[in-house]
Amino acid sequence: MDLQGKKVLVFGAGISGIGSCGLLEKEGAEVILYDGNDKKDAEAMKAQLGGGSKVRVVLGAFPEEEMESLDLVVMSPGVPTDLPVVLAMKEKGIPVWGEIELAYVCGKGDVLGITGTNGKTTTTSLLGEIMKNARDSVFVVGNIGTPYTNAAADTREDSVIVAELSSFQLESIHTFHPKVSAVLNITPDHLNRHHTMEAYIRAKMNIAKNQTPEDICVLNYEDEETRKMADEFQASVLFFSSKHKLEQGIYLDGEDIVYKPEKEKEGTVICKTGELQILGVHNYENVMAAVAMAAAYGVDLDVIRKSVLAFKGVEHRIEYVAEKNGVVYYNDSKGTNPDAAIKGIQAMNRPTILIGGGYDKQSDFHEWIQSFDGKVRYLVLIGATKEQIQREAAECGFHDCILKDTFEEALDTCVELARPGDAVLLSPACASWGMFPNYEVRGEEFKKYVNAL
């Protein structure tokens, strides 16, 4: 679609919506920024758009008579696609794109796209580092913090775009076509948005829906859901495995990470797990996925190896903060669902005071609680899910729960309970919304508190 002169509605005034407006204006579109919350500050939104912007801001109910004149609707990922106003626009035949689709249509270069329930940011960050060491024009975008729409206008034919993609972003793509994709794992998450596990999985699978046999999709052999996807995708599949020696793919053999792209040939040892600067089997899986994607794209294995060994990990992922009075503090604020938080507990090698709870995404916490396995001395709970988690903990035979009203009260309690030799771990198994704007702010508050002790 040529966007010059087209009337485009951007739905949602968050960071992605602002990025979409900027890109659309560069493309010559007439842009309306719409948010259903009529209590938002229209002037503040205009200020974010910049002084020269001609974007019109509409808050509250969208005028039905104006719908008829729209050529396109661009959804921000935080806005559900099944809202009545969105369904009404679809019924009128108005195309509805996500911001990823918009950026892809307007941008140039090859996309390497990563999705999955957990591990996306670590894998995207590592793949971004590898590509920056191998290519001149590299953009790391998407759910990782920089909207793809902010970068699209600067991309060139030889650019590589490394994109972290959430299920929200993938549910509204149409022509988006990565050269290399990856689905890292699938566990229940965001069911409050997608309603069913099947719908969540389908959204994730969209990452490969436009790929052809000339493209590559990297999948986790140890995850039942991702393994099944190999039969449905058109792309050539490359598996990674932490438990099986694969005939073809990338796998863990003792301490060796082995890349074996062809069945008939010997594999190449990329590195040993003991040489890595990040902890845990889940991180070895993230490394394997990034290595497989880079190698499939044609990056030299020596460049990959050097990049992997230099990689220090990602903020808010089992991040060492400090040792205070013999107690080690870890920030795993990115543990926003039970499966991710299990990885945090598994990485602990000390008795642990655990901070859990937050926004209710309709998760089940039994498996998370069962993973405590004698490591967790106390579970300090906050947020909307604290009573539910306490109930489920009791059902699992864990009774050392302490409920607090504020984050600071929870931290004070952890300091009181912790003994020399313990760890205090922020790995909440819940999203931060309701108490914090995002998991990054939650992690920063934790680090600020710890460093002030």
Where are these regions (language model features)?
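Phosphate-binding loop of NTP-binding sites
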Residues: 22-26, 64-68, 77-221, 225-236, ...
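Residues in the short beta-alpha loop(s) of Rossmann-like NAD(P)-binding domains
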Residues: 14, 37, 144, 222-223, ...
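N-terminal leader/targeting and accessory segments in enzymes
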Residues: 1-98, 102
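Residues at the starts of beta-strands that form the adenosine-phosphate
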Residues: 7, 29-30, 137, 179-180, ...
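C-terminal helical cap/extension that packs against the catalytic core
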Residues: 43-54, 366-422
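Short internal beta-strands
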Residues: 30-37, 217-221, 355-356, 375-384
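Beta-strand->loop->alpha-helix junctions that form or flank phosphate-binding loops
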Residues: 60-61, 97-101, 234-252, 307-309, ...
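Nucleotide phosphate-binding/pyrophosphate-handling subdomain across enzymes
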Residues: 2-7, 17-27, 137, 273-376
